[in-house]
């Protein structure tokens, strides 16, 4: 049995027991079931071939599986018909058989691991047995030889001399000669003998060649090395020699090589098989032995064979050519092997050009039967013409054995013949034609329009495959070329009309190419509504319409005509045509004017210089050649001959001049005097100068005259390559303002106005003139303001002169830089579209990139300036508002979450709502409103904006009064101000709810204007007074008793907030202020600030002096001794409510301008005054430094830095936040289980719990914090320090920044807790307030009054974090004290629940987020549980503080672990 091969190519030799085990297995089968094959049947089936090297293990396994499967299928068919016991027996027997087979296979595989070693041992044993047999057989044969054949044999005498020679000398000199000659080769001949022999053999060969009849084809021979080599190029190479010098000795053919090659289809392989060469070798050798002329016979034999082989090669090349490239263009007419090959090309019937009898061009290659020694002969039918001997000679040879080259040479010659015929036709039409034929690629180059470049010539090719004409002309569409080819192939004489047609087409192409760099659109046809009746219809049909894209209503028409007796030349006529404007895009236009250009081009230029139109003149006649060249030169000397310089000049001239003509017409239509179109720069540029510009509306006659006097020149020019950009140059002299820019230092100023013409509008149309007049109006409007500003400069106050400077004035824009460092800028220019001044703000220098503080009131500044365009007044407003706005812009305006009980609603801390240029309203959390009025001399007036401006008993809808605002603002009043105030008692007890200044404002607003703004004083040369005349107190007050009892409605001057980004509730009585009148510049009510809400500010210090000449006393007004305050602070009359603010003692008021932004802690509280609900509506005067302190974020005064929170805010925010927290507290007390106690003290809230009495009020020292005063019902239960901790915690952590209502709710719930629980909470608060006192603890604690974002998700972040029912739930934040400096300290949120019934303190079991760590909560819970087990609670004792303290002392997180 052959071995078995495993998957890894290991052979398993079949081994013992297979057959016997198989037999045993088969005998155990049941009689009812078919006998299974023996277990080794699979192996036996494969072992039939004994020569097989082995069997694959996979094959054996596959056989076994098939057998098991077949037996199983048999069982499934037979078992259902048997009883249960028989079925079980059959199943057991099947399982046993199958198991036994696979066990045997397993044993075979295990045995196969050592089969290789066994096989090697068997092979060695077999080899040794064979060797033993050989030895035994040799011994038997020798014994038989000795006993039978050599019985009488005797040995010779011992060769002792030979033995002595061998043993002594090592040689055998006495070796017999017969043996020596058999085994020892003779010595080789020497090199000299070899050369002599070969030289002698060469002489013998030369003698034999001379004396032998040698064919002339074998003349190419070489004799060397005793051989002669005959070489016939392209056929064969034979090497011969002779075996002796006898002339009768025959030639010997040593080597034969066939030189026939097929370089195109042979793929480098030999064409003759080696067996064929051997046969030919034997055949030639036999001829050399027997023939009388052996060499002639050898040549004839090999030559015939090579010609037949060449013919076969050409035939195979033809078949491949037909199959791969030429197809039906070449056909095999006849092929006789070894005789001839006939091919046909240019078969018109095959090509489908003609039917019936048609000329067929044949090429025949055959062997000359008469003279076999000749090479292959080539015949052409019909015969080739003798026009070009070189082409014919090439077509009659087949040197390289290439059928394709032979065909190409043949058709090349025939193509040259066809081109000669076509050239003859052209010469019959034009005797002077100059076409040429190129022989490299058969082509006829025909010039169409002289002079003609190579790219403009018509190239006529002959397709070498089909013999058809193929045409090429650059730029001509393929469809026309196809028509020309079809017509020319049908009849060659049809080329003449096509040449005539192409001549006009080429003329059009030359015109298009000549003007393609110019703004034009060319077309051969133009849809005109009046084409038949207009003179344009009488022109030649060969014409070109050139549309000027910048002048869409004008065309240049080029007419092309024949030149008599000159078939290759054209004459051009040029016309100028104007058309009407189309109603729709698809509607045809009408031709209006058609005139021919003048005869002389220079006349056209003279017309332009004199201002006449260029579309008049007579017919323009040109020479036949637009680009004449010397006839001696080559006619196609360059492509510039195709450039029509006359047409290009006409187009460029019209494109340049017509816009000026259009502009001149528009200026004339508008009656604007000008000098017409003028030529500048030696004819390189054109311009139109205006003599006078019409006056502008809304400009005074004086300003108009001054502007006309300063204007020196106004010139219009075209700029840019597209001639669509107009530049108007204005030259001014005597500029009223000189900026700091170096460009504005000369005696004259140049202003350039640029206008872009749209593509849909004609260049130089009315639109350009209208835009210029609008710009001129803008210049005049701004010039009027600048002129007035220049007149006021000599008398401008010194502070304004230092505050501002003129940076740029270019007649279109005025840019002023202002501020202490001149880092802010304001730009003023007139907007002709909106017909008003436009103001832009910015920053320059080191401040560039920052925001201008006046951007807040930009809209109000713009409206004010448009109402009263006075630059001095604008600068005064900027001066008065810069410092307040810088302070206001520091207020936080970002919306915040969690400020109220609706934690998801964002509230804006401060909303800045500018009402006018000097009136800014601040809304705090959409509840409280503060009005800030910017006044001169560095002061502002502040009032409670919740009160109506006209009736202090009425409130603005949406706002609430801020209690204590007047007292809080008085803390920032500077006692050293020039204007003296009234007493504090009179401030809080004014004589009337309506202030005197408010009356003045209302009276002045209701009265008609009686004086112009900035009245000119005699003797000041038109300058405006910058200081108001001193007036007495009585002259500044108007008597109007009827106004005392008249209340204006609150919504008389309703307005909405101009601040769109900071949208807040917009009360109906937001009243903007009028423009300021600084330093006594009186402004009449008619010229008041025209804001979008236009009304007068009741507390503005800029109210004008009453025009009434009557003097009287205001009823109930106190008399003020000394000079009138109006002489020092304009607008501050004694009746002005700004003087009603209380003035504390000098030592009690912070001084303005001090470096400290916090109030002194030792300042005594202000004097207690009788409260008036509308006292805060009376403005309080503050300096800019005091306002900066009021609005600048600073630490909370009166608090230790450690106790103050990290949230910095301004004193105003702290005051309003404290007021709003007090308001929240009052509402919370009504909702919670607290009892409110009535209090007579204003601004004080008193309430009590079961064990405590609480008093909440603003800090009397600063009014910036809300303080809690706690008084226990049972003094023995509380220690003083515990009460102080509770009060400090309320002041710093509950009612402090950021002033959240939910912290109050949580704190009031703590106050309502039982005393023992509250005391433990107070101890925790003490650890938070004074963390340094607990140095032995590892953690700092923070009592969370609202749920932090990182807490377990039990409620939304920001909601109250204290729940007090049968159990108490609160949150603590623990922060690790020791931490690595680069890392943030580890903080964890611990929810703690205290069971009042059992007294246990545990961590609340709240599900954590999936991504949060559970290590820290588990450790916290374990520590609290261990504390509860170790310290069981006592009756009436709270364990909160003890458990928390133990947690802070024992909690240790694993290294590197974070919660």
Curated annotation (Swiss-Prot):
Region (Interaction with SREBF1): 506-830
Bias type Polar residues, positions: 1029-1059, 1097-1106, 1152-1161
Chain segments annotated as transmembrane: none
Cellular compartments annotated: Nucleus
Any single GO BP term: somatic stem cell population maintenance
Function field: Component of the Mediator complex, a coactivator involved in the regulated transcription of nearly all RNA polymerase II-dependent genes. Mediator functions as a bridge to convey information from gene-specific regulatory proteins to the basal RNA polymerase II transcription machinery. Mediator is recruited to promoters by direct interactions with regulatory proteins and serves as a scaffold for the assembly of a functional preinitiation complex with RNA polymerase II and the general transcription factors.
InterPro entries: Med14_C (IPR056877), Med14_N (IPR055122), Med14_RM2 (IPR055113), Med14_RM6 (IPR055114), Med14_RM8 (IPR055107), Mediator_Med14 (IPR013947), RM3_Med14 (IPR056879), RM5_Med14 (IPR056878)
Alphabetically ordered keywords of this record: Activator, Nucleus, Phosphoprotein, Repeat, Transcription, Transcription regulation
A molecular function (GO) term: transcription coactivator activity
Subunit-structure text: Component of the Mediator complex, which is composed of MED1, MED4, MED6, MED7, MED8, MED9, MED10, MED11, MED12, MED13, MED13L, MED14, MED15, MED16, MED17, MED18, MED19, MED20, MED21, MED22, MED23, MED24, MED25, MED26, MED27, MED29, MED30, MED31, CCNC, CDK8 and CDC2L6/CDK11. The MED12, MED13, CCNC and CDK8 subunits form a distinct module termed the CDK8 module. Mediator containing the CDK8 module is less active than Mediator lacking this module in supporting transcriptional activation.
PANTHER family per the UniProt record, alphabetical: MEDIATOR COMPLEX SUBUNIT (PTHR12809), MEDIATOR OF RNA POLYMERASE II TRANSCRIPTION SUBUNIT 14 (PTHR12809:SF2)
Modification sites for Phosphoserine: 623, 992, 1117, 1124, 1133, 1141, 1149
Key word Phosphoprotein present: yes
Pfam families assigned to the protein according to its UniProt record, in alphabetical order: Med14, Med14_C, RM2_Med14, RM3_Med14, RM5_Med14, RM6_Med14, RM8_Med14
UniProt-recorded name of the protein: Mediator of RNA polymerase II transcription subunit 14
Motif LXXLL motif 1: positions: 75-79
Protein family per UniProt: Belongs to the Mediator complex subunit 14 family.
Motif (LXXLL motif 2): 1187-1191
Domain of life: Eukaryota
Chief place where the protein resides: nucleus
Ranges of Gly residues composition bias in the record: 14-27
